[in-house]
Structures are given as structure tokens and as C-alpha cells.
Amino acid sequence: MKYKLLPCLLAIFLTGCDRTEVTLSFTPEMASFSNEFDFDPLRGPVKDFTQTLMDEQGEVTKRVSGTLSEEGCFDSLELLDLENNTVVALVLDANYYRDAETLEKRVRLQGKCQLAELPSAGVSWETDDNGFVIKASSKQMQMEYRYDDQGYPLGKTTKSNDKTLSVSATPSTDPIKKLDYTAVTLLNNQRVGNVKQSCEYDSHANPVDCQLIIVDEGVKPAVERVYTIKNTIDYY
């Protein structure tokens, strides 16, 4: 018996016998919501999270908080964007997300809990066979989204009038470090910006602390901004 215990005892010293099972894929809801509400997607049995973006002076510029059901549906989502003076707070109610304060129906849902329509803006979303949002459209614009085999968002292309804005992301080849990525932004096929992010990860392969470098190449000379992202995540 003691010989059978040796491998496990060795593993305890090295990595631990009872390791957290890592989920490498992203759910359709998490990936799609991260595209629309501009936050880093998370993996695994997330119960609630807060993602905070801070500038070089340590000032908060953006914060996204969410609570999720065990099935992976967003029960609530709150976005505070100080740079654009935007506040959004949504709560799930059957087939809609309501404004958390006025209780006005804001977003209609499809399927289990996926985005379908934003009536006030005339925006509708389309999904693929796996439930990922791949298109958004209104009278003024059309957007297409791309994902890799694990559901990680690879970018989007937005067409409006005579302008085409494309963002293409390249994640790390290490599947554990998906949120280590570079991205390039093109406007009418002309490069106007790039992004690089590197993170530290928890046992669920989710980012805890990240450095985000954004370079605006649309101005001369180019302007570089450095941000810090901090995540607090609770799991089921």
C-alpha cells in the first residue's frame, strides 16, 4: 500500500493531488457578452466577477461586474465606463434584461439566455449553430464576430456607411493563457492601432492581474497608454 501512496505524496509536494479541473472553452454567452460589453471573457464555473481597468495614475476608468447562474447565464451585469460617461445595469427577467433601476425592458433574449435584440437602438443579433453571436445589425451598421475552436473571441469587423473597422486578435498559443494576446485595428485597411496584453492567472485559467498596452497609431507620433486590469472572481 505504501508504494501506491508514493506517486500521490510526490504529487502533493509538486503540484497537489487534488487539482482544480481547468475548463479551456468559453461558453457562447460569456464570449458573446464580452464582445458586446467589452470585457475579458472568463472560463469555468464563475459565480460572480468584477473586472476593473485602471490607468497609469491608478485611476479607475472602467468597471464591469456580473453575476451568473450555475448554467452560465448572466443574472445581472453592470458596466461603468468613466471615459465615455456610460453606466449600464441590467438584471435578468425571463426572456429580457431589464434596466436595474427603471425596470424597463432593454435587451430581448433568445435560446437559453443569449442576446437577440436591443429594441431601443434597432440592433438585432444572429447566432451560429453553437449559440455564439456572429452578427449584429441595424440600419446604420453591420458587425461580424470571429471565434477560435475554444470559443475565444478573435475580433470583429464593423461596417458603417463607407467605413470598415476591423479588429483582429491573436491569443497566446498556450491554451491556459488565452488572455495573453495581441490585436491590430484597421480602418479601411489602414492600420490605426494595436494592443498587447499579458496576465497572471488563477487555477481556473482566468486572468487575475493584467497589463494592457494600447497604442493609437491614428495620430503622429503614435500615443501609447498603459493600463492595469484587476479581476476578482468567485466560483461555484
UniProtKB/Swiss-Prot annotation:
Belongs to the UPF0257 family. A lipid is attached at C17 (N-palmitoyl cysteine). It is found in: Cell membrane. A lipid is attached at C17 (S-diacylglycerol cysteine). Disulfide bonds: none annotated. It is a lipid-anchor. InterPro entries: UPF0257. GO terms for cellular component: plasma membrane. Keywords: Cell membrane, Lipoprotein, Membrane, Palmitate, Signal. This is UPF0257 lipoprotein YnfC. Residues 1-16 form the signal peptide. Its main location: membrane. Pfam families: UPF0257 (PF06788).
